């Protein structure tokens, strides 16, 4: 019989539950679970994942170290880790209907921004050029954001970046100006991806522009990958050289990321007729490990494999169809209530509300919504002067659709937001001139002295609690 070299107290420490071992942390976690259960969750980059994904995420798979790739690890004992990673890769390709002869995938990326940096480093040398959608116009930090006076994203310090933008009248990407600028700038990489753009991207036009200037087309589908997997919006894979995505947004998996890359023939030399092959797999995999990361998070890869299996089901497609219906319901109701939407609506999982006609900023509206248990976020919109007090709010449907909300429910959500916008205006108007800054506004709405907020908080919490939350 084996002996136990350490004390009984040590053994108990290793085997105690969280509640028994660390009640302080357990209580904070319970409060967060209660917040989620009693809140209308509208942050477009969030979702509510399944219990099966949680089971895999909080598992002994996190015990194992496995630097390297399946069949080529720097540690022993990885036979089951290899099996999980290979299964995850196969499921990723299946979820997006990809031919493994033409596409490969890296599932070790820790998150979306690192995944994008890993791609850039694989395809470019320092100070090579990249073009991405400007952040205030719906892009993402990791696409090389900088201001006239400061480089914000590290991407813009390693590489030269130049933004493209939307037409401020229509809110749609200005492809003509993008093409003209790309011809002058000659980027090595053209990034097609967004974080707050509600319309479909014309990937075909992007491909033509990339080909015209000899650039790689990188699609960052982090927000919409679940919709793409379900086939309810057009896929970028027909046009892209590389596709990146996070795994925890509309895909409804654990927090992580994937990089998909082309394999096989890239083009044919017009002079010699010789096939020019893609050389992406080796450089991208090397950029992930050992270039930027060490050991992968095996518990995350395990949970991602579970989520990808779910993403290939009819139930997941039905869910994504409802995500789109619910976003369209928000559009219809907000317009009926007299609100302005950036790009005049949505083709995706979110809407972007323009608060300028109401004389408000997103920071104030977000603050009051949070007080009544509605979670969404302030967001920059085209023409904004400040990222701290932008004039938009972003409202997404994935999380509450996962909990079972319908179109009529989201119309009710729009009416709550309309109430809050009107309430914001009256609260701001009542503040004294010497104390009417954002910090004063936030202090007022958090003070418990606004009866409308207290009544709405109770009403929303009771309503939200009727929808299930897998924990």
Curated annotation (Swiss-Prot):
Disruption-associated phenotype: Leads to lethality.
Inducing stimuli: Consistently expressed at higher levels in vivo (intrapulmonary growth) than in vitro.
Enzyme Commission number: 2.1.2.1
InterPro entries: PyrdxlP-dep_Trfase, PyrdxlP-dep_Trfase_major, PyrdxlP-dep_Trfase_small, Ser_HO-MeTrfase, Ser_HO-MeTrfase-like, Ser_HO-MeTrfase_PLP_BS, SHMT-like_dom
Stored PROSITE patterns: SHMT
Cofactor(s) recorded in Swiss-Prot or TrEMBL: pyridoxal 5'-phosphate
GO molecular function list: glycine hydroxymethyltransferase activity; pyridoxal phosphate binding
Keyword Transcription listed: no
Biological processes annotated in GO: glycine biosynthetic process from serine; tetrahydrofolate interconversion; tetrahydrofolate metabolic process
Superkingdom classification of source: Eukaryota
Pathway membership: One-carbon metabolism; tetrahydrofolate interconversion
Primary localisation category: cytoplasm
Pfam name, any one: SHMT
Residues that bear N6-(pyridoxal phosphate)lysine: 249
GO cellular component: cytoplasm; mitochondrion
Membership in a protein family: Belongs to the SHMT family.
Entries under NCBIfam families matching the protein: PRK00011.1
Role summary: Catalyzes the interconversion of serine and glycine. Essential for viability and required for virulence in a murine model of established pulmonary infection.
Note: In eukaryotes there are two forms of the enzymes: a cytosolic one and a mitochondrial one.
Record-given protein name: Serine hydroxymethyltransferase, cytosolic
Taxonomic lineage of the native organism: Eukaryota, Fungi, Dikarya, Ascomycota, Pezizomycotina
């Amino acid at each position: 019989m084996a002996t136990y070299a350490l004390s009984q107290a040590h053994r108990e420490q290793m085997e105690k539950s969280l509640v028994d071992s660390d009640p302080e942390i357990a209580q904070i976690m319970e409060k967060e679970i209660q917040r989620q259960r009693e809140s209308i969750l509208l942050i477009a980059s969030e979702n509510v994942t399944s219990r099966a994904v949680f089971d895999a995420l909080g598992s002994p798979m996190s015990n194992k170290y496995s630097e390297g790739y399946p069949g080529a690890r720097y540690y022993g004992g990885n036979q089951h880790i290899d099996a999980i990673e290979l299964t995850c890769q196969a499921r990723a390709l299946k979820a997006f209907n990809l031919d493994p002869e033409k596409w490969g995938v890296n599932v070790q990326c820790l998150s979306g921004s690192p995944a994008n940096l890993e791609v850039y480093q694989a395809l470019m040398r320092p100070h090579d050029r990249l073009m991405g959608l400007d952040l205030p116009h719906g892009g993402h930090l990791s696409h090389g954001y900088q201001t006239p006076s400061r480089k914000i994203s590290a991407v813009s310090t390693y590489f030269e970046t130049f933004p493209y933008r939307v037409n401020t009248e229509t809110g749609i990407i200005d492809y003509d100006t993008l093409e003209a600028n790309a011809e002058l700038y000659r980027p090595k990489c053209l990034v097609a991806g967004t974080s707050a753009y509600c319309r479909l991207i014309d990937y075909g036009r992007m491909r033509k522009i990339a080909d015209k200037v000899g650039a790689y087309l990188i699609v960052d589908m982090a927000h919409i990958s679940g919709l793409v997997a379900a086939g309810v919006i057009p896929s970028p894979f027909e046009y892209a050289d590389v596709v990146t995505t996070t795994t925890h947004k509309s895909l409804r998996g654990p927090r992580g990321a994937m990089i998909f890359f082309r394999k096989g023939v890239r083009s044919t030399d017009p002079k010699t007729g010789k096939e020019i092959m893609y050389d992406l797999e080796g450089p991208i995999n090397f950029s992930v490990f050992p270039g930027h990361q060490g050991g992968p998070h095996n518990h995350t890869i395990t949970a991602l494999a579970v989520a990808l299996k779910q993403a290939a089901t009819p139930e997941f497609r039905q869910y994504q169809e409802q995500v789109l219906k619910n976003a369209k319901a928000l559009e219809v109701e907000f317009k009926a209530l007299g609100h302005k939407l950036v790009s005049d609506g949505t083709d995706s999982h979110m809407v972007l509300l323009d608060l300028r006609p109401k004389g408000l900023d997103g920071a104030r509206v977000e603050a009051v919504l949070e007080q009544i248990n509605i979670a969404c976020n302030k967001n920059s919109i085209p023409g904004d002067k400040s990222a701290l007090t932008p004039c938009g709010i972003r409202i997404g449907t994935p999380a509450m659709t996962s909990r079972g909300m319908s179109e009529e429910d989201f119309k009710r959500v729009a009416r709550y937001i309309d109430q809050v916008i009107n309430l914001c205006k009256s609260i701001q108007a009542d503040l004294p001139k010497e104390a009417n800054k954002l910090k004063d506004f936030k202090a007022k709405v958090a003070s418990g002295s606004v009866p409308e907020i207290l009544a709405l908080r109770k009403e929303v919490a009771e309503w939200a609690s009727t929808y299930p939350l897998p924990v």
